[in-house]
């Protein structure tokens, strides 16, 4: 069993770099400043959707999700969130083998890829039973990914395709 940090950044940021990268709340940013964050969300979304396509036999756990979570989003973010969910559902409905439970799973996958407005540390967990991996939320754009089996190359290649990075050891040192 190996646990890695799944991240959009290749290296850990020091305090000064982190302050430059996360210098404003998302709600205070203009459209141009939001672009890198939206790109990050799309990377995670593509990665999680690819995993789901590979292994539809998954178990997920959300600590909670309430309507008040939307209070932290600006109006444009709420619109972006709702439109993205609709787009995912339309895309899934176009597939021949679409189950009703897929709709909820797609929404949950999108929530997990979205900034950590909806969750808290270890608030989300997804277990893909055929691939034998567990993904646990850590912070914004950063997750633990635990390989419970020795066959992890397929997922590591998927991480690279999604332009994400796996780091090992830095969280324990």
Predicted regions and their residues:
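Structured alpha/beta or helical-core interaction and ligand-binding surfaces enriched in interleaved
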Residues: 1-142, 148-173
